[in-house]
């Protein structure tokens, strides 16, 4: 269901201390936006209504967090949820930021100097594999290679989904993009780890009897990347043919 336009969203976000108003202007300097810039930096790609961010960020003041979504009408809900979570603990929201960004173009906003330690991807759009739309998946190698450029060596991606096809495909996506899958499960709640934070979507799918799939993948050396953009591969083949 399409979310309705919220005329109050932009003014309220502009008045929010932890909203990044012009995210394309901070490349290489994101850490400087936080009260404690030397802390590890974790991103949530597609933070939605903020259910996950509102749980994890206040509980870990020793880590800086950034929640990203593409529209203000979604981000305003995350802002309110995060704000309430910090208020409930009586602590300042000084280790969290939210920003409106197109995840497919993160390179426009970040540089390798921004040093991402961990990325969370929770219940992203699974995208149909028809007509090439799977390239928009947040775990597609095309996307993972983009994240690699921003991540520290040994940094991790924590991924959860309800979608069987997306998860099974992702089990091949990550290694192709040079990530080692260090942990995986096809039923997260069967032996639920203590560290798992259930999101709104997670609870909804679980109540419907849909198993939650999850994995943790660690960034490996550049020489472990095997995936090549199809267009680049075609150009390479054309060049080799011309050389012959």
Residue ranges and their predicted role:
Residues 1-43, 51-60, 80-113:
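S-adenosyl-L-methionine
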Residues 43-45, 68:
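Conserved beta-strand/loop positions that form the S-adenosyl-L-methionine
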Residues 48:
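Conserved glycine-rich SAM-binding loop
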Residues 71:
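Conserved SAM/SAH-binding beta-strand->alpha-helix loop
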Residues 138-153:
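A short glycine-rich, Lys/Arg-flanked "PGG" loop and its adjoining helix->strand segment in the class I
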Residues 154-161:
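Conserved beta-strand signature within the Rossmann-like core of class I S-adenosyl-L-methionine
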Residues 170-244:
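Class I S-adenosyl-L-methionine
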């Amino acid at each position: 269901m399409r979310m309705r336009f919220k005329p109050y969203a932009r003014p309220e976000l502009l008045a929010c201390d932890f909203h990044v108003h012009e995210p394309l202007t901070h490349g290489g300097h994101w850490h400087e936006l936080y009260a404690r810039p030397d802390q590890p930096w974790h991103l949530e790609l597609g933070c939605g209504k903020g259910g996950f961010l509102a749980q994890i960020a206040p509980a870990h003041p020793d880590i800086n967090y950034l929640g990203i979504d593409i529209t203000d009408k979604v981000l305003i809900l995350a802002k309110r949820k995060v704000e309430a979570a910090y208020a409930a603990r009586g602590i300042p929201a000084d280790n969290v930021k939210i920003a409106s960004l197109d995840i497919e173009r993160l390179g426009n906003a970040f540089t390798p100097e921004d040093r991402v330690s961990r990325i969370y991807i929770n219940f992203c759009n699974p995208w149909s594999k028809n007509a090439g739309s799977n390239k928009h998946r947040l775990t597609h190698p095309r996307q993972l290679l983009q994240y690699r450029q921003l991540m520290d060596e040994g940094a991790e991606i924590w991924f959860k989904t309800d979608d069987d096809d997306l998860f099974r495909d992702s089990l091949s996506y990550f290694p192709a993009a040079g990530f080692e899958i260090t942990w995986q499960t096809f039923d997260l709640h069967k032996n639920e780890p203590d560290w798992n934070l259930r999101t709104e979507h997670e609870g909804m799918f679980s109540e419907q009897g849909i198993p939650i799939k999850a994995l943790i993948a660690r960034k490996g050396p550049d020489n472990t990347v095997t995936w090549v953009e199809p267009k680049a591969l075609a150009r390479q083949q054309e060049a080799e043919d011309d050389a012959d």
